[in-house]
Swiss-Prot record:
SS bonds (residue pairs): none
Keywords: Repeat, TPR repeat
Protein name: Tetratricopeptide repeat protein 9C
Organism of provenance: Bos taurus
Designated gene of the protein: TTC9C
Residue stretches of each TPR repeat: 8-41, 72-107, 108-141
Family (UniProt): Belongs to the TTC9 family.
Matching SUPFAM superfamilies: TPR-like
Pfam family, any one: TPR_19
Length: 171
């Protein structure tokens, strides 16, 4: 168990190094490998097949904390990588960001990335929700403010079109 936690840390570090070098595909591979090392170790997740195979010793609180921190960091970093790759898979960015937010609801980077994903998936209400939360945590972040402004413009455009539609229907 300790070995798998250490291996996951090494893969995560390789992913971080690749990210710094702009090798996003390799970074994604490193983060995925780290998560694979951790699969099945998380006691808070139900096992797909209970009581199958040998039951390992329970994690210590420190190991469980390291497990959750590593998982959260990997998901957050995966979302960051995917935003740098073409074409961007916004569904995955959304999914990974939400996994981070399950454990760290105040994570400003994950809130921002979720907002960006929802914006590009044209779910502007959800985008606004996440971007407002991000701007509350990082009020000076220009990227967050820019996406929030773009989201507000899309929402007001949508509401104008909706109003015109209803006026046309009901005169």
């Amino acid at each position: 168990m300790e070995k798998r936690l250490q291996e996951a840390q090494l893969y995560k570090e390789k992913g971080n190094q690749c990210y710094r070098e702009g090798k996003y595909r390799d970074a994604v591979s490193g983060y995925h490998r780290a998560l694979l090392q951790l699969r099945g170790l998380d006691p808070s997740l139900p096992s797909p097949i209970p009581n199958l195979g040998p039951q390992g010793p329970a994690l210590t609180p420190e190991q469980e904390n390291l497990l959750h921190t590593t998982q959260t960091d990997c998901y957050n970093n995966l979302a960051a990588c995917l935003l740098q790759m073409e074409p961007v898979n916004y569904e995955r960015v959304k999914e990974y960001s939400q996994k981070v937010l399950e454990r760290q609801p105040d994570n400003a980077k994950a809130l921002y990335r979720a907002g960006v994903a929802f914006f590009h998936l044209q779910d502007y209400d959800q985008a606004r929700h996440y971007l407002m939360a991000a701007v509350n945590r990082k009020p000076k972040d220009a990227n967050v403010r820019r996406y929030l402004q773009r989201t507000q413009l899309e929402l007001s455009s949508y509401h104008r079109k909706e109003k015109q539609l209803y006026l046309g229907m009901f005169g």
